[in-house]
Amino acid sequence: MKEYWTSLASLLGVLAFCQSLMNSVFPPELRFAISKLFNKFFKLFSTFCYFDITEIDGVNTNELYNAVQLYLSSSVSIAGNRLSLTRAVNSSSVTFGLSNNDSIVDTFNSVTVVWEHIVTQRQTQTFAWRPMPEEKRGFTLRIKKKDKNLILDSYLDYIMEKANEIRRLNQDRLLYTNSRGGSLDSRGLPWESVPFKHPSTFDTLAMDPVKKQQIMEDLKDFAECQSFYERTGRAWKRGYLLYGPPGTGKSSMIAAMANYLRYDIYDLELTEVKSNSELRKLLMKTSSKSIIVIEDIDCSINLTNRNKKQSTGSYNEPEMLTGSGLGDDLGDGNTITLSGLLNFTDGLWSCCGSERIFVFTTNHIEKLDPALLRSGRMDMHIHMSYCTFSSVKILLRNYLGFEEGDLNDVVLKELAEVVDRAEITPADVSEALIKNRRDKERAVRELLVDLRSRVERNEKNGKSRVQNVSLEEQENRAFDSLYAEENGGEEEEIEDNICKSSDDCS
């Protein structure tokens, strides 16, 4: 054993002497050339190729590095031995990551690859316009040469898609509102945000189940059909108009849409917008996968002069009143035009962003300009009506835990008879049930009493839904009359609640 250690020490001494001799005899340029030659020789016979993905590319952040980091976080939680744990701002879950200089094996299309997380110390900077992190981070991807052309491009595309999905699932949705008077927030953005945690879903929405299913299918088709919009040359956007009496669930519908698609919401307050250019800047700062909401649009727009000639013979441009609201003098504030909004919903500016939904709400559809309602701007008109028997059953299930079989047939029959004639909103039914939610039987009894009293009052005032046309028909009839008046009395048929106008303001 002693002879072994003696021989090893002698060998190390000889190697050290040879190295010092080479350093003194051979110049650095020659040594570098020899080292480069050996590396080429090694690569020639190596069966692997390597790809480095650094955290910072020059002075810019490498998007691919962040995508790889997110993608591997879904695998290392199971396969890794030493992990790093992080939780980003606005994130709802903890993210797993590879520790420094650790590696993990991944498989894609039956091809095995190896990822290694490389962390090294960066050289000290004497001066730099942009300070760099002290550590230099990156991933190294090792793939067999025979598999490189087979999977590399598709594998990286898959990583980007997977990372976007993980980011969307982990990040809490946000509710944005435009800053007052066009001011900027601390990050220089015109939108202020808070976490969006509204519990409304399509399951809890008091609405006809058939209509809900149609809306859900339409939303799903929109989110999954990017190729359709590209093929047909249309901007990837969709518009929904929610109309009906107050308290019928228009805001809950918007929240259910956002929760169903996992989109952010931008609540655009038009009274804080001063001009068309400011409106354009606001809308350009919205992100994809978002819902842009303008509530009570009939209260923000002056449409009384639309297509009516002044004494000079010219047409008035409809204006959105901003600043202090509709009740103030127009001379005291700035105005934006209806065309400024329409140009962004389906004009040239509609392509500045993708996968966005515009939602307008109103209590009086007959007050809206036909140009705002035509197809291509508001693609789907959704009437939020008074409670029906099916929506009352949903509310009984939500607030009292009642299923249809829990109520006796007499109560169900009476509910079915009076609810349509009562003209009661889901908000009123919800309030009646919340007050007595600890006593379910009493809650149902008081709801029936309230429904009967409303029926008697409506019949006394001649407003019974049985004797008169429905609210939805009244809205369409009012809009039809407005349309006919603007076209010299010509009558046009309005089908499927989609209003068509021959006057194109865009």
Curated annotation (Swiss-Prot):
Pfam families for the chain: AAA, AAA_assoc
Reactions mediated catalytically:
ATP + H2O = ADP + phosphate + H(+)
Ordered alphabetically, the record's keywords are: ATP-binding, Hydrolase, Magnesium, Nucleotide-binding, Signal
Q: Which domain of life is it from?
A: Eukaryota
Where along the chain is composition biased (Basic and acidic residues)? Answer: 497-506
Q: Does the keyword Nucleotide-binding apply?
A: yes
Q: What is this protein called?
A: AAA-ATPase At4g25835
